[in-house]
Amino acid sequence: MPELRSRTSTHGRTMAGARALWRATGMTDDDFGKPIVAIANSFTQFVPGHVHLKDLGGLVADAVAEAGGVGREFNTIAVDDGIAMGHGGMLYSLPSRELIADAVEYMVNAHCADALVCISNCDKITPGMLLAALRLNIPTVFVSGGPMEAGKTVAIEGIVHSKIDLIDAMIAASNEAVTDDQLDQIERSACPTCGSCSGMFTANSMNCLTEAIGLALPGNGSTLATHAARRSLFVDAGRTVVEIAKRWYDGDDATVLPRAVANRAAFENAVALDVAMGGSTNTILHLLAAAREAELDFGVADIDTISRRVPCLAKVAPNSPLYHMEDVHRAGGIPAILGELDRAGLLNREVHAVHSPSLATWLADWDVRGDAATPEAVDLFHAAPGGVRTVEPFSTTNRWSTLDTDAAGGCVRDRAHAYTADGGLAILHGNLAPDGCVVKTAGVPEECLTFRGPARVYESQDDAVAAILAKEVTAGDVVVIRYEGPRGGPGMQEMLYPTSFLKGRGLGRACALLTDGRFSGGTSGLSIGHVSPEAAAGGLIALVEPGDEIVIDIPNRTIELAVPADVLDARRVAQEKRDRPYTPADRQRPVSAALRAYASMATSASDGAYRRVPE
């Protein structure tokens, strides 16, 4: 029988000093011997997805106490990718994932906590906590802050948009046809409430995936931050973590541990969900890194295989202007998408979750498109936006009058009515990316699925943005942004501004963008990222010259630089004769010691850009 980890500091004569300190936090004699649950909060006033989390750790702690445990809260950092976007702040976003993972590990292990609740929400916080949970492998439950409501009606260039988001504001900012007054209206409407940005961007994608992988409760990925129904997720997370902690420590039931829940079959299901819902390309980085922490042999080849057989069942912003997360919720949330995949025979059924003994039980109870969903599930998915600007959680009780169960033309479709027969994410290979690169096919216009054009080469995101705004990029071009990978950036910046500004200039369907950096979950269009190997590691992208023809064929999963091999060989010889080969020729970019430390240990995007620490 495993012993409570916390006994190390709560039992025995020599731990009198530690117990004295525990007592100073409010613990009593009755608490020693109960499971101590670490509550990793990520409240910050910098991030709308986290601004409302301040008191929610206490809500979890109260539920932990009621269930027979002792909750102790701490905080991690949280970077807002949208605020950090388009300047040097974005260099810190991906590296913050590793810092968050380390911070959770440090706090949990330093204080010998027995179990963990992760209160996450935005882009790198959920992945960072997921890495930590799989690394620690103690009973863990995730509960996120929830999605933001979509921005409401505005007119852009004479067209009324019933729902808008952050990306609409970014695109409008570079559109000369949008007046300052119109832009101000869009800006003020785009982000109306607390919560993670309202589309199927990185934050919401990852929160949906923690639900699919079995470490979060049903409804976690889609229940709005502002809705009163979300309160029960925090209470239930506190109760559930104590239940599974007791099953492990009192019953030696290892099936409740994160690595048993998030096993290979669960990862495959998570990827199936990801490609079915057209999730952010960043999810691939994070799932690869998480699989490594779980000690699973799971790589881009596995993701590629799944993406070829799983259809795209949902197109949510930025892949469609019609739907946001509030619409996914009305359609039954993640259980509805999983239910459609299960009925199509596309899920591994031999999985379980922290809340259910089997996938069959899980979906029977929570899939509102099935015939046995519980009243609790039906009630939850009626939760609707409040339509009021607020930073307060649980502040609306609005309800949809009906659910969207239209599998033929609704927000979530069945296999027979899928948007495409293969998934919303794809892995491409070729001489430009022998280790692979990633494209969100759900956001690519059909006429752009095959594309060829001359390269316009930039050695920083800043130079590319300047060129786009100066109208130097024209229809038919392939914009190549290199030396922005994990090592070359360092930090693997997101390229949301270049893609948004291309759209704002009317080039969203006329150009391709290729980078060894990455893209925001808000990106759509022919945007290909994670080119591996990256330029700084000697990848072929470092040898591309202006005017070179690049050929992209998404249906056949290929990407090629159409330059003769002998010419490329000569370019490589010249590159390696430089004083500092595989570095930008003229870029001036301050790089701090913290970023240099990340760069020195960062692996390729094809490995998840995790930090490889020497033995």
UniProtKB/Swiss-Prot annotation:
The active site is at 520 (proton acceptor). It holds the Pfam family ILV_EDD_C. It comes from the Bacteria. GO terms for biological process: isoleucine biosynthetic process; L-valine biosynthetic process. Keywords: 2Fe-2S, Amino-acid biosynthesis, Branched-chain amino acid biosynthesis, Iron, Iron-sulfur, Lyase, Magnesium, Metal-binding. GO terms for molecular function: 2 iron, 2 sulfur cluster binding; dihydroxy-acid dehydratase activity; magnesium ion binding. The keyword Iron-sulfur applies. It catalyses: (2R)-2,3-dihydroxy-3-methylbutanoate = 3-methyl-2-oxobutanoate + H2O; (2R,3R)-2,3-dihydroxy-3-methylpentanoate = (S)-3-methyl-2-oxopentanoate + H2O. [2Fe-2S] cluster binds at residues 122, 197. Mg(2+) binds at residues 81, 123-124, 494. Its EC number is 4.2.1.9. One of its GO terms (cellular component) is cytosol. It is an enzyme of class 4 (lyase). Pathway: Amino-acid biosynthesis; L-isoleucine biosynthesis; L-isoleucine from 2-oxobutanoate: step 3/4; Amino-acid biosynthesis; L-valine biosynthesis; L-valine from pyruvate: step 3/4. Belongs to the IlvD/Edd family. Homodimer. Functions in the biosynthesis of branched-chain amino acids. Catalyzes the dehydration of (2R,3R)-2,3-dihydroxy-3-methylpentanoate (2,3-dihydroxy-3-methylvalerate) into 2-oxo-3-methylpentanoate (2-oxo-3-methylvalerate) and of (2R)-2,3-dihydroxy-3-methylbutanoate (2,3-dihydroxyisovalerate) into 2-oxo-3-methylbutanoate (2-oxoisovalerate), the penultimate precursor to L-isoleucine and L-valine, respectively. This is Dihydroxy-acid dehydratase. It comes from Salinispora arenicola (strain CNS-205). The gene is ilvD.
